[in-house]
């Protein structure tokens, strides 16, 4: 069993192998650890990207902005309204797939336009326990999940911040 220190080292090593990376940054604990690790490894070549949406609390976006400003981390915001997606509004069991697909289409498009080869998001191993239809969208876009790769559970994430 890996120690928390080993997991943190694996996470930072993963980012060290990249020339640059966009981090999908909500401001939650998972994406905060992910961004902090990416920034430690890549410096200005780690870019935080936050989706500002009507269905996300404004306080989350404000917290994400504040975190990046306090640490001088490059940060971009993309506005998006999932309520414009008919598939999402129909409220099927897999509505998260449609929302994630639309969100990561925008994030990956941003990365491509800015010649950033990697996009990372903050899923951890405990997320596998839940029904997560949005995971399919991440796979379709080739989005990486370094916390999962480094075997982080939610308790590891909280203990690392």
Language model segments and positions:
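ATP-dependent adenylation/nucleotidyltransferase module used to activate substrates
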Residues: 1-161
